[in-house]
Amino acid sequence: MSKTLLHLAVCALCSVSAVAQTTKDAAIYAPTATGEQLTNLYLNSAILNGGSAVLPGGVAGDARGMAVVNGKMYVCNRDAEGSKLIELDARTGSLLRKIELPADMWKEGEKALGFICNDVQVDNAGHIFVSNMATDMRGTVVTNAFRVNYVDVTKTPVAYKTVLNATLPATLPKTMRIDTYDLYGDILNGDGIIMLPVSGNEAGAGNTVIKYTVTSGVADAANPQTIVLTKFNPEKAVASGAAPRINIIDNDLFYHDGFNTMPMLYDMNGAVVDGFQNNKPLTPASTGQNGVTEFELNGSYYLIVASTNTDDKEAPQAFDIFKFKDEGRSFAAMTLLYRFPQAGLGGVGNAVRTALPRVEIIDGEGGHKKALINIYAYRNGYGGYEFVNNVSTGITKVEGEQLDYTVSGNVITVNGAAKAISLYNVIGQKVAETVNGQTVKAPARGVYVLNVQCKNGNTKTVKVVID
């Protein structure tokens, strides 16, 4: 954990805004010791809305899936009148358009599919796809069908093409409910895969992922591959539970995250490759919120997971961002950088379980790239953050013996008056500060990062344990 804590070292001059804002995350996320920094662009959350539910763009309707492409966020929406995509500016959260979707894309003849416009995804070529929810794919009638439609939102009315329309054999013993999906490749014009995680609390359903191969823009709906997941975290879990999410990394690997389970990396045979079982101290606070994504930025590799549930006491419905040590992307060697939003999105309870991080890599300063991170949690809000990894921190890392201090109870005393003494918890939140003093008091027992700005301007950082 010491390596993790050193990565959380922060500059003593950074501060946290004392005034709550209605459109911004009030927290300031200090640079890490390795040059990352997270900056909020906007935040529309239940916490900033007095605890009340938040609707994307203020548009009524049921909105579950979210995707981002070309600087725009798209959120699924359905109501009694039909379905639409809510288009938002990914940097400001402003409502741009309410894009009505053709009713015919959810029908077979005069018969309609169930639970239309439930999830939205973007393929590697930037095409947008929307699906329904199938409460049971077993059978041959229209209500059993799971359908994925490409939609061209640049046209009015929206043009669409069905790329997958599939059912499963009625002889399967368990209910095969599909809430979500993911895709990889050029699904519209080229080759790729579409994968459906099955919801459920029983083995035979909730430990299953259905995979379809796409060739030249045509999905082989008649020949799906059934992937049985061999293990879960926690080990006692036998199935994912409600509304699992997957994130396809490439043709060989994917993440799976369920209501009953932690995010886990699998191969296409269902064998476990890696996961938080190999780094238990960094395990998310709880299961129950489903969302995970991995990305590369300027040669470094990162992971974002939905880390807290709506009942968390400190930061309900928040996300964790981790840094892998290298391109091997080992969980055992990764470090926690930030938990965000620092106060969470909100505690509005729901059965949907959607808590999605989406990342778009865009041009930054000086030839570097930066990441535009958008988050969305059903009824609890959404926000945008900018993430860079080329910040000059000016932090001097030292070993513990180079910074003399004593601990008496919860009070830490350093050797000589300092310009500023700051104390941070393990997720980078400032918990105490002293200016022009020699002592600082920890709020409780635990592990902290002590940051001291000396009178000569040097900054020293060390891990401190209060027991």
Question: Language-model segments: which ranges?
Answer:
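Beta-strand-rich domains and repeat architectures in extracellular enzymes and scaffolds
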Residues: 47-83
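Repeated scaffold domains used in trafficking and secretory/extracellular systems
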Residues: 60-65, 106-121, 165-187, 230-249, ...
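C-terminal tail/sorting-segment detector
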Residues: 66, 447-467
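Short glycine/acidic-enriched loop and turn motifs that connect beta-strands
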Residues: 79-83, 134-141, 199-205, 260-262, ...
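Blade-level signature of beta-propeller repeat domains, shared across WD40, Kelch, NHL, RCC1
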Residues: 347-392
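Residue-level detector of functionally pivotal "anchor" positions at catalytic/ligand-binding pockets or at interdomain
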Residues: 387-411, 415, 419
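Terminal processing/anchoring signals of secreted or surface-associated proteins
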Residues: 391-398, 423, 428, 448-450, ...
